[in-house]
Amino acid sequence: MEASLSLFRPVATCCRRVALSSSSSSSQKAAAVAGISVRYQSTANRTKRMLNIPPHESFLNVPVEGDRIIFNPPSSEASVYHTPFKFLPRSDPRRRANIYKLFKPPQAPITTPESSSTDAAAADQHGDLPPVLYNPTKSYNVTPEQVEEIRELRAKDPKKYSVTYLSNKYNCTKVFIMMCTQAPREHQEQHKLARARTAENWGPRRAAAKLDARRRKEMLHRGEI
């Protein structure tokens, strides 16, 4: 009896081991199935893979053997007048047409009946050249008596009779008014104080910009720039 039991003991041990291994493998499979993550379309890799679209042929570089001038025309029929001036040969008549178009005035200037005859004669003489530019005639319409009056008004009330007011009244430039007279010293001091109060409200960036502009102006007057 004991001999028979000793014979069956290794078989029982093997069966027990097989049962244990099968149970452990089944539990591992169940755990693995329970822990599997489902991947949807919102996964980063899949989205990146879908967006990885090859570029269009128009974005690709042209091979060296196929170098050419690229011209993207609009949605209309191409015209010969679109050829750049640099790419036209010297014997091409379009160069002369382009030069004429460059020097042609954009619109006809306003002319008076007196100047129309002279302009017509000049046009016949010079051909299709641009119109002649004339310097404006200087008008000396302020008399010495008016200059004295300007000085009196400026000294009387510099706030009311400002440079702009006097230039409009006597039909002259602001530079001429400032050449004729200057504001009283008290008015100049008040103007400086007002500018100083305005500068106090500036931020650091604007103050630095004003300082740089003042330095550049001084360097320009000294001929350094």
Curated annotation (Swiss-Prot):
GO terms for cellular component: mitochondrial large ribosomal subunit. One of its GO terms (molecular function) is structural constituent of ribosome. Coiled coil: none annotated. Keywords: Mitochondrion, Ribonucleoprotein, Ribosomal protein. InterPro entries: Ribosomal_mL58. Signal peptide: none annotated. It is found in: Mitochondrion. It holds the Pfam family MRP-L20. Residues 106-138 are annotated as: Disordered. Its main location: mitochondrion. Residues 109-119 have a biased composition (Polar residues). Component of the mitochondrial ribosome (mitoribosome), a dedicated translation machinery responsible for the synthesis of mitochondrial genome-encoded proteins, including at least some of the essential transmembrane subunits of the mitochondrial respiratory chain. The mitoribosomes are attached to the mitochondrial inner membrane and translation products are cotranslationally integrated into the membrane. Belongs to the mitochondrion-specific ribosomal protein mL58 family. Component of the mitochondrial large ribosomal subunit (mt-LSU). Mature N.crassa 74S mitochondrial ribosomes consist of a small (37S) and a large (54S) subunit. The 37S small subunit contains a 16S ribosomal RNA (16S mt-rRNA) and 32 different proteins. The 54S large subunit contains a 23S rRNA (23S mt-rRNA) and 42 different proteins. This is Large ribosomal subunit protein mL58.
